[in-house]
Design a protein with these regions (language model features):
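Short, intrinsically disordered low-complexity segments
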Residues: 38-71
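Conserved small/polar residues in nucleotide/adenosyl-binding loops
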Residues: 78-79
Length: 80
């Protein structure tokens, strides 16, 4: 299985015309996301702008769900 990763962007900054985001490898730690892409009281929302995963997600898939699905994919792959 290829490396799974997601590109998470600061949605507030994106809407202001500035691309602030980073690639993360699951399991994604939300505190790390907040620190790396500048989520705070002013910029609270994020969006998934790209991904390399063996399943489909959308831009508003919660990080917890991405982590859960990645765990299932990894477990399934090891049992092949």
């Amino acid at each position: 299985m290829e490396q799974m990763r997601v590109y998470i962007a600061n949605l507030g900054k994106y809407n202001e015309g500035e691309l602030v985001g980073a690639w993360f490898t699951p399991p994604v730690d939300f505190d790390e996301v907040k620190e790396q892409i500048g989520l705070n009281d002013e910029y609270e929302e994020y969006a998934i702008h790209d991904y390399e995963l063996p399943f489909e997600i959308d831009e508003y898939t919660p990080i917890e769900e991405i982590n859960r699905l990645c765990n299932l994919a990894a477990v399934s792959y090891t049992h092949l």
